[in-house]
């Protein structure tokens, strides 16, 4: 019997309980979710309700803004920039996990200009983070106005940039597939690193899409991975080339993980094509504004009037598309 295993990415951390506990909307704790009995959905080694009481019946302090310095800026394409940012030691140490991301903002802008950006690479020795940013609208355009040696506001750490994290952590000494397209090449790098660290044979299927060059090539060269470049998506469907590659691989190898870093439609089509017999993980494409589950930008509605806050909810990818209401 299959059932949905859900988790809160912040549970058991220094940021738990959060503001959702104050309004009776905690993802895991029944006592802090408008119920009157103890029935934790997923025990994380600490009692969230007890932490709430000990903290004076209020949420713990949230993430902080840090004024950081841009140590390098590269213009890769007309709409793609790569920033390397010097951050405090404690922040750099908190962003090493797959799925880590931060909110970036031009210091001259108001807080609603915060843009969620996934970590592409992190250097814990020099305390720098590297991010790739697709410049498409107001938030990212204001960030693009900043140049090397100028200051930028960084808010973090956040960790829910990837769904199905448990499958990534559990994938060891096996064969793993990563499919990445367009800007999804950037958040794929920490996943590749983790899978290689866990002694997996990793195959990367990369699609540059509209970009002229593979902007993660230098990172990939540092690891012993197999790279296949092909078009993955065309006219709303998977390409025949991708289908053939995937079919050959699942027939030849015992695959312990399939990770997709791309648009929701690509993730959905891959899972639809290969079925439920595999462990999946994917990038979290939910719209985010506050990162704390409060503003509602990240919410998705499902059958049974269920609302999921995707900036905090950690769940298998198939449950993000199964039973989802579009209206």
Set out the residue ranges of the language-model regions.
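Short Fe-S-cluster ligation motifs
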Residues: 6, 53-74, 301, 311-327
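FNR/FR-type flavoprotein reductase catalytic core
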Residues: 141-287
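Short, charged low-complexity linear segments at domain edges
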Residues: 1-25, 259-287, 326-327
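Long terminal accessory regions outside catalytic cores
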Residues: 1-69
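Ferredoxin-reductase
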Residues: 56-150
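Local cysteine-cluster metal-coordination motifs and their immediate loop/turn environment
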Residues: 15-42, 264-265, 285-317
């Amino acid at each position: 019997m299959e059932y949905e295993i859900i988790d809160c990415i912040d549970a058991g951390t220094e940021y738990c309980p959060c503001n959702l506990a104050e309004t009776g909307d905690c993802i895991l704790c029944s006592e802090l979710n408008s119920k009157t009995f103890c029935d934790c959905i997923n025990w994380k080694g600490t009692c969230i309700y007890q932490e709430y009481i000990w903290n004076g019946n209020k949420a713990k302090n949230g993430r902080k803004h840090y004024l950081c310095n841009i140590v390098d800026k590269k213009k890769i394409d007309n709409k793609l920039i790569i920033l390397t940012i010097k951050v405090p030691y404690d922040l750099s140490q908190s962003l090493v996990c797959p799925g880590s991301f931060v909110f970036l903002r031009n210091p001259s802008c108001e807080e609603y200009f915060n843009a969620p950006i996934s970590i592409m690479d992190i250097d814990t020795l020099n305390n720098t983070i590297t991010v790739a940013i697709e410049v498409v609208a107001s938030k990212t355009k204001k960030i693009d106005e900043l140049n090397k040696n100028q200051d930028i506001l960084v808010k973090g750490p956040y960790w829910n940039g990837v769904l199905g994290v448990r499958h990534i952590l559990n994938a060891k000494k096996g064969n793993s597939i990563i499919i990445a397209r367009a800007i999804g090449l950037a958040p794929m790098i920490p996943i590749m690193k983790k899978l290689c660290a866990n002694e997996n044979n990793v195959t990367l299927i990369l699609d540059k899409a509209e970009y002229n060059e593979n902007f993660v090539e230098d990172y990939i060269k540092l690891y012993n991975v197999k790279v296949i470049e092909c078009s993955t998506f065309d006219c709303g469907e998977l390409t025949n080339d991708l289908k053939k590659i995937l079919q050959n691989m699942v027939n030849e190898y015992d695959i312990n993980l399939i990770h997709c870093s791309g648009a929701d439609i690509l993730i959905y089509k891959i899972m639809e094509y290969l079925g439920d017999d595999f462990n999946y993980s994917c990038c979290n494409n939910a719209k985010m504004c506050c990162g704390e589950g409060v503003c509602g930008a990240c919410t998705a509605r499902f059958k049974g009037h269920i609302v999921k806050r995707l900036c905090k909810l950690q769940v298998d990818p198939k449950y993000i598309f199964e039973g989802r209401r579009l209206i």
